[in-house]
């Protein structure tokens, strides 16, 4: 989808390493920072990205091994589970529906199409707001973010919560440790064993 979005600008992105940097941060940031687009061009590129992502790209992703079992184990343990993503909320829900996981979660919070909620900290703040509205005893002190890129760890730090990293994701274990994760687990089984 990133390649498709960049075609009109003559920007050709190849290889996994070059494309991986687009996973995690908001598209607006990525297109201006990594591709040198102006704010106006980035907005047009986001529209083009979504032209492909919504009908096609959303169905090309795969669930990491063990994620379903972890979500189910956390649910059985009574944990409140909220997905927070820099992707637009509607697309997050689409992906979760594809994997039949939407009903397993308590809330899904993503970026807004108008740019009001865009960065990880903005998404987290919206998640905190919703949790406080839904759960009288909600406390940030009992909240942890599980993530796979430094954007997750940075957002957690800025939001005043701990981040637990997973080493098999897009950032890798070293990135998560360097970003300040309080723990890093190499697979879902180890994560479940540590937290349930």
Question: What are these regions, as identified by a protein language model?
Answer:
Residues 17, 72, 95-196:
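Asp-based, Mg2+/Mn2+-dependent phosphohydrolase catalytic module
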Residues 57-62, 86, 162-163:
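Short, flexible loop segments at the rims of nucleotide/cofactor-binding pockets, characterized by
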Residues 13, 21, 43, 61, ...:
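Non-catalytic, surface-exposed connector residues within folded enzymatic/regulatory domains
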Residues 24, 28, 64, 68, ...:
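Alpha-helix N-cap/helix-start and coil->helix boundary motif
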Residues 1-68, 77:
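N-terminal helical cap/lid subdomain that shapes the substrate entry/recognition surface
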């Amino acid at each position: 989808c990133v390649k498709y979005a960049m075609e009109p600008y003559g920007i050709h992105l190849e290889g996994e390493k070059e494309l991986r940097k687009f996973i995690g941060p908001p598209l607006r940031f990525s297109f201006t920072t990594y591709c040198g687009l102006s704010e106006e061009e980035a907005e047009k590129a986001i529209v083009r990205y979504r032209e492909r992502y919504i009908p096609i790209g959303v169905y090309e992703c795969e669930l990491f091994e063990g994620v379903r079992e972890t979500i189910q184990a956390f649910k059985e343990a009574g944990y409140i589970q909220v997905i927070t993503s820099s992707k637009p909320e509607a697309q997050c829900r689409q992906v979760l529906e594809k994997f039949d996981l939407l009903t397993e979660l308590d809330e899904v919070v993503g970026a807004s199409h108008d740019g009001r909620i865009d960065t990880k900290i903005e998404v987290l703040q919206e998640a905190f707001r919703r949790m406080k509205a839904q759960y009288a005893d909600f406390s940030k002190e009992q909240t942890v973010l599980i993530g796979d890129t430094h954007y997750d760890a940075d957002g957690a730090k800025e939001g005043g919560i701990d981040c637990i990293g997973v080493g098999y994701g897009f950032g890798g274990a070293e990135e998560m440790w360097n970003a300040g994760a309080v723990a890093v687990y190499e697979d879902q089984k180890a994560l479940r064993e540590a937290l349930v």
